[in-house]
């Protein structure tokens, strides 16, 4: 059976392709910016592996997750097997959903407030334990993670020219948890 690799970043798919070649498994590269989906056609038979990233926008693929959703919905409507389906994609692009699922599973997450505007961010920080961090709801690679020791630092950043909004417009204000130097990550 043929494998189809849905992605937007060749760097991440090379190790998989190398392994598939060693196993002599046929595969096809489905870079989302090259894949054309015709809903009147049936997708090919095979196994589809979704390797979409929340940080695709930093590589110039702003709408890759949305287009991947189109692809996955099309595949699922034809009963194709998708590894990392729409549920995985939803988790990948939303820290809010990640935190909710972690908490549901009994894994404690830091206190987090999700803000859709600069005003919400500044207001929410007033009653927040210091220090705290901000981060992007939809991101990877540590995008948008900043440490603030007090309200003034945050306001200066948010009102200044270096403020970096999340690609989905949601910035997280989060309790800062200092790393334990005895723990190796």
Model regions and ranges:
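Short loop/edge segments at beta-strand edges and connector loops
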Residues: 31, 84, 114-116, 149, ...
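Short acidic/polar capping segments at secondary-structure boundaries
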Residues: 87-89, 116-120, 138-141, 151-153, ...
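Hydrophobic alpha-helical segments and helix pairs
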Residues: 97-142, 147
């Amino acid at each position: 059976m043929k494998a189809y690799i849905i992605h937007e970043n060749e760097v991440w798919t090379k190790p998989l392709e190398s392994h598939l070649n060693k196993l002599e498994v046929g595969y096809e590269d489905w870079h989302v910016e090259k894949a054309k989906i015709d809903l009147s056609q049936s997708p090919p038979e095979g196994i589809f592996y979704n390797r979409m990233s929340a940080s695709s926008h930093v590589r110039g693929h702003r709408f890759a997750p949305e287009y991947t959703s189109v692809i996955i919905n099309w595949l699922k409507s034809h009963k194709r097997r998708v590894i990392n389906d729409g549920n995985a994609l939803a988790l990948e692009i939303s820290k809010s959903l990640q935190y909710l699922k972690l908490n549901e599973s009994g894994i404690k997450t830091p206190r987090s407030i999700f803000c859709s505007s600069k005003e919400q961010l500044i207001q929410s920080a007033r009653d927040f334990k210091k220090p705290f961090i901000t981060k992007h709801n939809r991101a990877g690679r540590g995008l948008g993670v900043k440490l603030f020791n007090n309200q003034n630092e945050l306001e200066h950043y948010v009102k200044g020219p270096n403020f970096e909004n999340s690609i989905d417009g949601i910035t997280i204000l989060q309790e800062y948890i200092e790393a334990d130097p005895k723990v190796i990550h």
